Curated annotation (Swiss-Prot):
Organism phylogeny: Eukaryota, Sar, Alveolata, Apicomplexa, Aconoidasida
Binding site for Mg(2+) 2: D253, E304, D331
Active-site positions on this chain: E218, K356
InterPro entries with a match to the protein in the record: Enolase, Enolase-like_C_sf, Enolase-like_N, Enolase_C, Enolase_CS, Enolase_N
Principal location class: cytoplasm
Residues found modified as Phosphoserine: S42
Modification Phosphotyrosine occurs at: Y139
Species whose genome carries this gene: Plasmodium berghei (strain Anka)
Name used for this protein in its record: Enolase
Length: 446
């Protein structure tokens, strides 16, 4: 029996930062299926276009009424009557025919907006799962050609200390995450993570005062930390005090594009200070040396965006130096774009993809980016954005794609915990057919 799309309606809702975003209700003969898209703060210049209205009299220019209009008036009429199980066909139709905009890196979604296309793409996945009488994670696994019997629960990468563009402190690196690789299950990994988080909170309160325990966009803390060493010392002490030494490791997201000077080709580790300390302006090679030093001193297992999104040379240097032991993740470098991934493979620039569905703008293309990375023995980390909604789609996606790792904030703030709570449910429903990635998180490739 065909399960056709009978109605599509888009609306403007608010994300976790109070900015507008797109939500879609897609109706089939089986009911209404809803999806909402997230939005990033530190965005890569090569991401597919997130369409904003730029009408300064409304939401400071961040409204998404044009994207809503594009869905309701351009996309919806073309999709009514199509079978909701035709995911690839519908995604390709929206991206290539209805939008059709391109750059040298592929389909850019600059006509209709990646936020418009993705909201429908996600809702269609939910409708397709219902039509196939299966869960969303199993349906997504089928779309990706993955094993649907034995499935992998991811290691959570919990962002607990914030810096960079996410925080008002002096810290240049954007995220410091705890990664409970030594836990026996996802449920226990979250317990380890939550206990370290609360231990860290009390340590920060003692050292920096109660104001420093206010949380940022992703639920992490932003105490007045000056540099990476101070942040890492604080994490190591908190992990030890919570009783999880050797079981909880550390990951960093540097977001180095945010403090790169394109003219001088240098990195300013004091970029948030008006009269910056010139000794903290580093060359690419000096930054390579700093990462090598940090990895020797601290239990760091993953570094994301260590250099600018166009600094292929230093990415390759770092990957060659420490890539065997440390995951080097491309986010702004790759923007979940298969063409950028091909270039990174050719240049041996990194060894892992950060998968953000809204960077590329359709589920079909996101799956393609993941499969290309896994085929080349890269790790893949599924990720949220700093502006999130209560939508839990990425929790199902990470299990479906068997990537073994997810980052979706601290164990705090409901839009972050919504994803982790969905993973608790999935782990429970899988029972003996689900296994936790643990310290093999880089190897979930089948």
């Amino acid at each position: 029996m065909a399960h056709v799309i009978t109605r599509i309606n888009a609306r403007e809702i608010l994300d976790s930062r109070g900015n507008p975003t797109v939500e879609v209700d897609l109706e089939t003969t089986l009911g209404i299926f809803r999806a909402a898209v997230p939005s990033g703060a530190s965005t890569g210049i090569y991401e597919a276009l997130e369409l904003r209205d730029n009408d300064k009299s409304r939401y400071l220019g961040k409204g998404v009424q044009q994207a809503i209009k594009n869905i309701n008036e351009i996309i919806a009429p073309k999709l009514i009557g199509l079978d909701c199980r035709e995911q690839k066909k519908i995604d390709n139709m929206m991206v290539q025919e209805l939008d059709g905009s391109k750059t040298e890196w592929g389909w850019s979604k600059s006509k209709l907006g990646a936020n418009a296309i993705l909201a429908i793409s996600m809702a269609i996945c939910r409708a397709g799962a219902a039509a196939n009488k299966t869960s969303l994670y199993k349906y997504l696994a089928q779309l990706a050609g993955k094993n649907t019997e034995k499935m992998i629960l991811p290691v959570p990468c919990l962002n607990v200390i914030n810096g960079g563009s996410h925080a008002g402190n002096k810290l240049s690196f954007q995220e410091f995450m705890i990664v409970p690789v030594g836990a026996p299950s996802f449920k226990e990994a979250m317990r380890y993570g939550a206990e370290v988080y609360h231990t860290l909170k009390s340590e920060i309160k003692k050292k920096y005062g109660i104001d420093a325990t206010n949380v940022g966009d992703e639920g992490g803390f932003a105490p007045n930390i000056l540099n990476a060493h101070e942040a890492l010392d604080l994490l190591v002490a908190s992990i030890k005090k919570a009783g999880y030494e050797n079981k909880v490791k550390i990951a960093m997201d540097v977001a180095a594009s945010e403090f790169y000077n394109i003219e001088t080709k240098t990195y300013d580790l004091d970029f948030k200070t008006p009269n910056n300390d010139k000794s903290l302006v580093k060359t690419g090679q000096e930054l390579v040396d700093l990462y090598i030093e940090l990895v020797k001193k601290y239990p760091i297992i993953s570094i994301e965006d260590p250099f600018d999104q166009d600094d292929w040379e230093n990415y390759a240097k770092l990957t060659e130096a420490i890539g065997k032991d440390v995951q080097i993740v491309g986010d702004d470098l790759l923007v979940t774009n298969p063409t950028r991934i091909e270039k990174a493979l050719e240049k041996k620039a990194c060894n892992a993809l950060l998968l953000k569905v809204n960077q590329i703008g359709s589920i079909t293309e996101a799956i393609e980016a993941c499969l290309l990375s896994q085929k080349n023995n890269w790790g893949v980390m599924v990720s949220h954005r700093s502006g999130e909604t209560e939508d839990v789609f990425i929790a199902d996606l990470v299990v479906a794609l068997r990537t073994g790792q997810i980052k979706t904030g601290a164990p705090c703030r409901s839009e972050r915990n919504a994803k982790y709570n969905q993973l608790f449910r999935i782990e429970e429903s899988l029972g003996a057919n689900g296994s936790f990635a643990g310290d093999k998180f880089r190897l979930q490739l089948n």
